[in-house]
From Swiss-Prot:
InterPro entries: AAA+_ATPase (IPR003593), ATPase_AAA_core (IPR003959), DNA_pol3_clamp-load_cplx_C (IPR008921), DNA_Rep/Repair_Clamp_Loader (IPR050238), P-loop_NTPase (IPR027417), Rep_factor-C_ssu_arc (IPR023748), Rep_factorC_C (IPR013748), RFC_lid (IPR047854). GO terms for biological process: DNA repair; DNA-templated DNA replication. Keywords: ATP-binding, DNA replication, Nucleotide-binding. Belongs to the activator 1 small subunits family. RfcS subfamily. Signal peptide: none annotated. GO terms for cellular component: DNA replication factor C complex. ATP binds at residues 43-50. Pfam families: AAA, RCF1-5-like_lid, Rep_fac_C. CDD domains: AAA, HLD_clamp_RFC. This is Replication factor C small subunit. GO terms for molecular function: ATP binding; ATP hydrolysis activity; DNA binding; DNA clamp loader activity. Gene3D superfamilies: 1.10.8.60, 1.20.272.10, P-loop containing nucleotide triphosphate hydrolases.
Length: 315
């Protein structure tokens, strides 16, 4: 069975990691000196936090990386018992081979409960001579200050377009795909700097055809073309509510889009609309209200229709 491409093409070493050049430079320095503090990786999903941690371990330990590296997902195992058992048991044993210390990687550590984080802080202190921790999170504000102060913090930003393009072209070449310019642009649009999402969309599109076109990408990603969203919003802004609502229903039915997905794309189009700054402010406010109501459980079609109606009377 074929591996997911995100795993098949995951970088094995720090030198292979795409983007984040300054971060990779500092991590490589830790490997060369065989010395590092506890680390905190923060950033949105799919930007390379886990990949960087795995590559660091492989560069640091070589063939014994599996024995000296423990990876846990804190969103699945978020209670204090995990810290007291799995983490503590691994942290207090000596490293294998000539490794200076072991590494424990806690993915999505912002999901740890407050009690678990306090227990983790004590474990970090107690075993700091033979163990280092790498914490990965989406929201660093959810990590308690005593842990943050013990870590060197690395902020992973969304990947740049050129980094995404380079990697997508490389994978396409290895998989014998014809990645068209429109297909690349579409993947860049739907992934928003998320390399994992970009590769997953590419693999899904490749299951449909070896010719990766704009149309296929938007279809498999269940996203509308930006011009489809712009057409709908422009109709609404021009007071053509019925036509705008018809376009909305087409997006929801033909493209299988959720109300939340459509709302996010409308929000992304706001800066490009030919309306005044004041009208853009009022529109963003209306989008925020619509988003809140949908999250609270209101009917998506009714709320999005109400948003389109408001667009026609913006002041």
């Amino acid at each position: 069975m074929q591996k997911p491409w995100v795993e098949k093409y995951r970088p094995e070493t720090l030198s292979e990691v795409v983007g984040h050049h300054e971060i990779i430079k500092r991590l490589t320095n830790y490997v060369e000196k065989k010395s590092m503090p506890h680390l905190l990786f923060s950033g949105s999903p799919g930007v390379g936090k886990t990949t960087a941690a795995l590559a660091l371990a492989k560069d640091l330990y070589g063939d014994t990386w599996r024995e000296n590296f423990l990876e846990l997902n804190s969103s699945d195992e978020r209670g204090i018992d995990v810290i007291r058992t799995k983490v503590k048991d691994f942290a207090r044993t000596k490293p294998i081979g000539d490794a200076p210390f072991k590494v424990i990687f806690l993915d999505e550590s912002d999901a740890l409960t407050s009690d678990a984080q306090n227990a983790l802080r004590r474990t970090m202190e107690k075993y700091s001579d033979i163990c280092r921790f790498i914490l990965s999170c989406n929201y660093p504000s959810k990590i308690i200050p005593p842990i943050q102060s013990r870590c060197a913090i690395f902020r992973f930003s969304p990947l740049k377009t050129e980094d995404l393009v380079e990697n997508l072209k490389d994978i396409s070449e290895k998989e014998n795909l014809n990645l068209e310019k429109g297909g690349i642009d579409a993947i860049i649009y739907v992934s928003e700097g998320d390399m994992r999402k970009a590769i997953n969309v590419l693999q899904t599109a490749a299951a449909v055809s070896d010719e990766i076109t704009e149309e296929i990408v938007y279809k498999v990603a269940s996203k509308a073309r930006p011009d489809e969203i712009k057409k709908m919003t422009q109709l609404a802004l021009n007071g053509k509510f019925v036509e705008a609502r018809e376009q909305l229903y087409n997006l929801m039915i033909d493209w299988g889009m959720s109300g939340e997905d459509i709302l996010i794309q409308v929000f992304r189009e706001v800066p490009n609309l030919d309306i005044s700054e004041k009208e853009k402010v009022h529109l963003v406010e209306a989008i925020g209200e619509c988003d809140f109501r949908i999250v609270e459980g209101s009917n998506e079609r009714i709320q999005l229709s109400a948003l389109l109606a408001k667009m026609g009377i913006l002041e």
